[in-house]
């Protein structure tokens, strides 16, 4: 009788394909044509590496275009990658005023669209990636795996082979749920919830005019939306947060290092104080259910509120399902790499102390696969655009075999990145503030001193 029933390791490995394909001759595939994905492409181009950018949307910065009406807090001088700038200037591009605060639409039209054009036909739109694997290998098979090219499948069935994959697809399409337990609130899937930044004073005005809208969340996206809603006449606005007070959301007013951000918090505070915006603190959403033509939202403590519309500004989470056949080493809490998690975990330290990091911290057991940008941070709300740019530079250097450069990570963010907006607290601890949309899109370098590792800003 045979002593094996299910195949042995030897027989399993003997089935591996012997492909004549030279993976090193294939391009590096970059998933996503947002700021970090295009920055990665610019660094790859600068190093003479073949690349192909696959963007699911119709244009560069497709996610940013969805909040094109929003003006950001950090000026142009913090929002442009160095390699991207060099490439653009070589094509005759004139940089915007470095002190100007751009809108999302301006970031796309003045920076990302010209950058995609400069990168040429190597940037493809309407190319949604649905799966990544190794050619001829599922996740279990090992022998010869590292020499096999990556296989990228698109939603139309097309398959592309690559020597490496840089996943900069972001998290915009996977927002966090309203439910306080990490699961959708009871009934949440049956009601309409807006998770983007609606243009309530423009294209979406009719949907909110004269209605009662509930905004859930305590970040800058929530604040921006609340201020816009408050400008609509005959409109009732309610704001629900989990915290016991809104101090973090208000910020430091006129003392803020970024005046536009400070003004945002001060205006929101005034609206709450005046009663124009009703604030519900300690509100942990448990149930969402239709109540006639309205929606009833119930907190864990039994409080409820009936509204016409809900805007969930609760942040985003990564979706790693497209890489389910790759060997990933994900932190069980954050969903970042296990090596990166201790550096960014908001439960452990102030996000202002996140150290520079690059290819080594972003690496998985699957050689040649890197997730960069906001997706690399998992659920940590501490990502900054400048961090993503340095990730792109480091990973491109690693793929070029220049490990000295890859490991010489020099992030120009001295003690920056507190993910709350409580400037008074930040100043007391001598740390800077991070701000932005969709996981800290924007960079805000501030010259500040060191904070102890025991501090916490983002819990």
Question: Model-predicted segments: where are they?
Answer:
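Short hydrophobic core segments
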Residues: 31, 54, 159-173, 216, ...
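Glycine-rich dinucleotide-binding loop and its adjacent helix/turn
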Residues: 6-21, 104, 169-232, 237, ...
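N-terminal Rossmann-like FAD-binding beta1-loop-alpha1 element of flavoenzymes
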Residues: 26-53, 222-232
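C-terminal, flexible cofactor-proximal segment of oxidoreductases
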Residues: 2-11, 15, 317, 323, ...
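Active-site substrate-recognition segment that forms the wall
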Residues: 212-249, 261, 356-380, 386-398
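Feature captures the FAD/FMN-dependent oxidoreductase FAD-binding
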Residues: 94-164, 169-174, 279, 286-297, ...
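A Rossmann-like FAD-binding core segment of flavoenzymes
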Residues: 127, 131, 230-332, 397, ...
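Glycine-rich active-site loop/strand segments that organize a redox cofactor
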Residues: 59-110, 196, 200-202, 239-258, ...
